[in-house]
Amino acid sequence: MKVTIFANASAKTKKVAGELHTKLLAAGFEIDDEHPDIVLSVGGDGTLLAAFHHYSHMVDQVRFVGVHTGHLGFYTDWRDYEIDQLINGLLEDNGQSVTYPLLAVDITYADTDATDHYLALNESTLKKLGSTMVADVYIQDELFERFRGDGLCVSTPTGSTAYNKSVGGAVIHPRLDALQMAEIASINNRVFRTLGSPVIVAPYETITIRPQQQSHFVFTADQMDTQPRPIEQIRYSIANRRIAFAQHRHNRFWQRVGTSFIGLDEQ
């Protein structure tokens, strides 16, 4: 089996990654950074997001494993002191995996005919800096609402516990194929109205955002952001590709939610 280690730059993580590298070689694994079968992310959820985007061009061909060097993360099944158990799990691997949906993003710009395509694991946002964003929101190409506020966030189920949750979005089990749109500081009064709550759409439905100002907007996809540009529309859909995690020991989702946000293990 060919594996690679994708680690962040912290001193603790470098030490763990070095130990993992040594033990992988001793166990007979081949280290291949170009065409791995498994990507071992060492760090936190941010490191795994970076690893996903680094290998997104071959996401159909790799599986991911997260090793956390801090507190419990949503994408990490192993702790830094469990390297030996992880190695044993890899030695017994038979290709088992759990897969989650990804977000496909297509952007059309007002100043060019080109369309940019992005893939996100967590979420994508659209914001207008310095003033209120006005945008028409379409679901399945039918006008749903005219939004006024700071911006909009569209997330995957796995991303529902990230930025989406901080702006009032719902937490969705990652095995569901769905998209969620959450409003960021929407304006609601007697003159201007939005739904004022998160919207969850079916896996075959698209969400399209069409800004109503000839202005520059900031677009993000996970950790990546773009320079402000005049955007004509952004179309969101469930991607036809999925991310796969090696299922040697996949922790229960609701247990992670309770541990991370409620502190059930401390009560």
From Swiss-Prot:
Gene Ontology CC annotation, any one: cytoplasm
E.C. code: 2.7.1.23
Top-level taxon in the UniProt lineage: Bacteria
Keyword DNA-binding: no
Keywords noted in UniProt: ATP-binding, Cytoplasm, Kinase, NAD, NADP, Nucleotide-binding, Transferase
Keyword Zinc carried by entry: no
Cofactor(s) listed in the protein's UniProt record: a divalent metal cation
Main function: Involved in the regulation of the intracellular balance of NAD and NADP, and is a key enzyme in the biosynthesis of NADP. Catalyzes specifically the phosphorylation on 2'-hydroxyl of the adenosine moiety of NAD to yield NADP.
PANTHER family (UniProt xref): NAD KINASE
The protein's name: NAD kinase
